[in-house]
Swiss-Prot record:
Name of the encoding gene: SEC23
Family designation: Belongs to the SEC23/SEC24 family. SEC23 subfamily.
Localization, UniProt: Cytoplasm; Cytoplasmic vesicle, COPII-coated vesicle membrane; Endoplasmic reticulum membrane; Golgi apparatus membrane
Record's keyword terms, sorted: Cytoplasm, Cytoplasmic vesicle, Endoplasmic reticulum, ER-Golgi transport, Golgi apparatus, Membrane, Metal-binding, Protein transport, Transport, Zinc
Name of the protein in question: Protein transport protein SEC23
Signal sequence, renumbered to the chain: none
Topology relative to the membrane: Peripheral membrane protein
Species annotation: Mycosarcoma maydis
InterPro entries: ADF-H/Gelsolin-like_dom_sf, Gelsolin-like_dom, Gelsolin-like_dom_sf, Sec23, Sec23/24_helical_dom, Sec23/24_helical_dom_sf, Sec23/24_trunk_dom, Sec23_24_beta_S
Cystines in this chain: none
Chief location category: cytoplasm
Gene Ontology cellular-component annotations: COPII vesicle coat; endoplasmic reticulum exit site; endoplasmic reticulum membrane; Golgi membrane
């Protein structure tokens, strides 16, 4: 089985592709049976299926798939999950062994149904914009927002809230002059108060009554509460085609917050109130409808609910050290506030994106729940003028071949499995849908105690880690060739306005515990990423040393189980081909910014962890173990070891860490470049060595999201630290005698970190020695 082909077809990578037949054997394999699933994985050969799916009777409700046994004469099918017999619906009457519908063909283990019920409401985009920033930043942000209006579907509903010292909800339906409803930035508003002030409740009049379209007068006939709320909301949320001119005018005239700021103070910024108003407005008017709240913040919240630092500049925003020492004054209260906000949004299928444009921290750590629980985007840039923000923001609105946005809204993911397996949980950007089906296991990994989750929004990149446990007791006889099945069912609102159901069904064989088939089926790349997600999930709760010890313990146990060795003889230690680079992944994961917070701000740590929990196997591996290409005069570009020995004066290196793309010129290359040899005749070869990495870097930048930081640096330059921090320090200031290493063995790295070689020696010694618990 080629795991890449399976991923292309079904969007699934499994840690094990043959499963242990009993619970005890499954625990001995150390790495749990788990899947990294990309629900909207792009697949061009999927047929359009314009009818409703056939499902098993309740409570099973599994969807018809190629693994079902069918009786074409009796027009029956047997569900492989609950073994119930079901009759085909009347429109399947012409079914025969040579005339099968697409969902029963073996090549369509993944299929997407376009459901007959269209969405009642088009997608909603509510911009929440910070105005406490300098004029250049605000101008760049205004321009980006105006451009984004042209990228939205014409029928999409759009709204605008701006905030600084106060939060203002702009009434787009009033075109006589700019009009907005103002909320005080220091006050915490209950959802009902927000709805009353905006006139969204039946019988309520907005503050400043008499506004056009205000609902609820004594003479009006009663309406359903939601219809009334939507009428009230139509003053604030209008189709783009209807309000583009008005909204563009408001954006172009947007000024910096007028409240005076003393030299020793920060701006008064009420981020929490602005978000409360946005979430309160949407949950009343459009519950369980596809919507995105897009928050653009140019600095930290300094007043009202959700504040992360005071307005006094002499008070620094919290660091990792402050949080560890419980010395972060506003931290716990802010986390609690934003998480409660995120849960309210997620419960209604609404997504919150956070775009930060500031050199200092903006409180992304406290706000991480907004994006993590609603599967929103998180973008971190030094300013809104930077290409990282502008290109990432506009790339969000990419369209498919039919001209629809490549995003799904208000999504749920449901997982079904055969009786031998139970679902332990999901690690990714979701909240539990609290579905207590028979598939729910006792062991909890990530978001557990459910077999369904709300994802709120989806893109073709969204990947979720789902973890399982084997529950078959030991000693129970197993039928030869028996297999287990897992079905992933994703229901979402497509950008075209239709509801769609993507169904992926996979089957894998069971094998006895001692069988070599289990070891041979190990996918070390998928396993590394799925274990990295568990480690990061633990790191959010525990402190890092405990997580590192857990990772080391798991690695030692895996090697003890699957390596070949003679007891107490480290030189005899051998790992099979499909386990050989797993320890290397763990070495780089231990040193990565996901688990080592030194040199990163809390906001950066929150951002890096957010992105890791979004991406598929290949992109996640680049984050864990970056790729390094070498360009020299001796031959074509080639991948080289992520090691200090790869630094040579006569080569150019291209490092891809996913978050950074860095071109590094060796010492000699840098001197020649500065001397301008590349522009002289006869040095075309040198010019090519300089240009090739640039061209390859542009290819990497072309489809990456978020846009990585692009760095060009020279050996011994200050920016070279980005490369040196990622390399295995096989040559350090302590190698090769007292005064550093000799010239040809790579650059010396000044570090006390152990090298991969030392790490592997320790691993071998521990694996072949006494067993580790």
């Amino acid at each position: 089985m080629n795991v890449d082909d399976v991923e292309d077809r079904d969007g699934v990578r499994l840690s094990w592709n043959v499963w242990p037949s009993s619970k005890i054997e499954a625990t001995r394999t150390v790495v749990p049976i788990s899947a990294l699933y990309t629900p909207l994985k792009e697949r061009e050969d999927l047929p359009p299926v314009l009818y409703e799916p056939v499902t098993c009777k309740p409570p099973c409700r599994a969807v018809l798939n190629p693994y079902c046994q069918i009786d074409v004469r009796g027009k029956l099918w047997i569900c492989p999950f609950c073994l119930s017999r079901n009759a085909f619906p009347p429109h399947y009457k012409d079914i025969s062994s040579t005339n099968l519908p697409a969902e029963l063909l073996p090549k369509y283990t993944t299929i997407e149904y376009t459901l007959s019920r269209p969405a009642q409401i088009p997608p909603i985009f509510l911009y929440v914009v910070d105005t406490c920033m300098d004029d250049d930043d605000l101008k760049a942000l205004r321009e980006a927002l105006v451009v984004s209006l042209s990228l939205l579907p014409p029928n999409a509903l759009v709204g605008l809230i701006t905030y600084g010292t106060m939060a203002q909800v702009h009434e787009l339906g009033y075109d006589a002059c700019p009009k907005s409803y103002v909320f005080r930035g220091t006050k915490e508003y209950a959802p009902k108060a927000i709805q009353d002030m905006l006139g969204l409740n039946p019988g309520a009049r907005p503050m400043g009554a008499g506004a056009p379209g205000a609902p609820g007068g004594p003479s009006q006939a009663p309406r359903p509460p939601n219809a009334t709320a939507q009428m009230g909301a139509s003053r604030f949320l209008l189709p783009v085609s209807q309000c583009e001119f008005q909204l563009t005018q408001i954006l172009e005239q947007l000024q910096k917050d007028p409240w005076p700021v003393a030299n020793d103070k920060r701006s008064q910024r009420c981020t929490g109130v602005a978000l409360s108003v946005a979430v309160g407005m949407l949950e009343t008017t459009f519950p369980n409808t596809g919507a995105r709240v897009m928050l653009f913040c140019g600095g930290p919240a300094t007043e009202g609910p959700g504040m992360v630092v005071s307005t006094e500049l002499r008070e620094r925003i919290r660091s990792h050290h402050d949080i560890d020492k419980d010395n972060a004054k506003y931290y716990k209260r802010a986390i609690k506030f934003y998480e409660a906000m995120a849960k309210r949004a997620a419960g209604n299928g609404h997504t919150i994106d956070v775009f930060a444009g500031c050199l200092d921290q903006v409180g992304l750590l406290e706000m991480k729940g907004l994006a993590n629980l609603t599967n929103g985007h998180m973008i971190l840039a030094d300013s809104f003028q930077m290409g990282i923000f502008k290109q990432s923001f506009h790339r969000l609105f990419q369209k498919d071949d039919q001209g629809h946005l490549q995003m799904g809204f208000n999504a749920t993911l449901d997982v079904q499995c055969t009786k031998e397996l139970k679902v332990s949980g999901l690690i990714g950007h979701a909240v539990s849908a609290n579905k207590k089906s028979g598939c729910v296991g006792e062991t909890e990994i990530g978001i557990g105690q459910t077999s369904a989750w709300k994802l709120c929004s989806l893109t073709p990149r969204t990947s979720a880690g789902i973890y399982f446990e084997v529950v078959t007791p030991a000693g129970q006889p197993m039928q030869p060739g028996s297999r287990g099945l897992i079905q992933f069912v994703t229901h979402y609102q497509h950008a075209s306005g239709q509801y769609r159901l993507r169904v992926t069904t996979i089957a894998r064989n069971f094998a006895e515990g001692g069988s070599g088939q289990i070891a041979a089926s190990f996918d070390q790349e998928a396993a590394a990423v799925l274990m990295a997600r568990i480690a990061v999930f633990k790191a959010e709760i525990d402190d890092s040393p405990d997580v590192l010890r857990w990772l080391d313990r798991m690695l030692i146990r895996l090697c003890q189980k699957f390596a070949d060795y003679r007891k107490d003889d480290p030189t005899s230690f051998r790992l099979g081909e499909n386990f050989s680079i797993y320890p290397q992944f763990m070495f780089h994961l231990r040193r990565s910014q996901f688990l080592q917070v030194f040199n990163n701000s809390p906001d950066e740590t929150a951002f890096y962890r957010h992105v890791l929990n979004t991406e598929d196997v290949n992109n996640s591996l680049i984050m864990i173990q970056p790729t390094l290409m070498s360009y020299g005069f001796e031959g074509p570009p080639q991948p080289v070891l992520l090691d200090s020995v790869s630094i040579r004066p006569d080569v150019v290196l291209l490092l891809d860490t996913f978050f950074h793309i860095l071109i590094f010129h060796g010492e000699t290359v840098a001197q020649w470049r500065k001397a301008g040899y590349q522009d002289q005749e006869g040095y075309e070869n040198f010019k090519e060595v300089l240009e090739n990495p640039r061209a390859d870097a542009q290819d990497l930048l072309a489809d990456r999201f978020p846009i990585p930081r692009y760095i060009v640096c020279d050996q011994n330059g200050s920016q070279a630290r980005f490369l040196l921090s990622k390399l295995n320090p096989s040559t350090t200031h302590m190698s090769g005698g007292m005064y550093g290493s000799s010239g040809n063995s790579g650059a010396a790295i000044f570090t006390d970190d152990v090298s991969l070689q030392v790490f592997m020696e320790h691993l071998k010694r521990l694996a072949v020695g006494a067993s580790s618990n």
